[in-house]
A protein has these predicted regions:
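Class II aminoacyl-tRNA synthetase catalytic cores and aaRS-like
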Residues: 1-167
Length: 167
């Protein structure tokens, strides 16, 4: 089918969601061999969608999530003064974690920075999380973060050793 019209009276938004959710779940169970990822559809508020995904219609298959890391720049063991000053003036700092990118060539990072500029941004700062004896950060701004601040950043963002963080 291409379209489904529902005639419902005296209902709330949740009633419509429940009916459509059950209809779609049962349809896919009956006619598809694929296993459903979930039987309850995730519900994301408009504000959360814009903050976490940068759009009001996110593709949840895309693992990139925008994280607010503003609080990191109030720490004494973070010395990235440009961002610290911005945060003091009320700005927010958000980042995206890219998984398993420690072995990517420099051109990978340069191309992402170029893309951000083409899209109207002023560029991206980034670093990759590594662990030799201790957790450290490699990249243009890596030296501004202590081991403890990186651990906190990893906790906030879900980043792991080998991931890169773009601000």
């Amino acid at each position: 089918f291409y379209q489904l019209d529902l005639e419902m009276s005296f209902v709330e938004q949740e009633d419509v969601f429940d009916v459509v959710e059950q209809l779609l779940v049962n349809t896919f169970k009956k006619f598809s061999k694929r296993k459903l990822m979930f039987e309850k559809f995730p519900k994301i508020s408009y504000a959360d969608s814009l903050l976490k995904y940068g759009t009001d219609k996110p593709d949840l298959r895309n693992p990139l999530i925008i994280n607010d890391i503003t609080e990191i720049f109030s720490r004494d063991d973070v010395s990235f003064e440009i961002f610290k000053k911005l945060v003091k003036s009320g700005s927010k700092v958000r980042c995206i974690v890219t998984k398993n990118t420690k072995d990517k060539p420099r051109s990978f990072f340069d191309n992402i920075d170029k893309w951000a500029k083409v899209e109207g941004g002023s560029g991206l700062a980034y670093f990759t999380i590594e662990k030799n004896k201790e957790i450290s950060a490699k990249g243009p701004i890596g030296k501004f973060f202590s081991t403890d601040s990186l651990k906190e950043l990893m906790k906030i963002t879900g980043a792991e050793i080998g991931d890169s963080i773009f601000l």
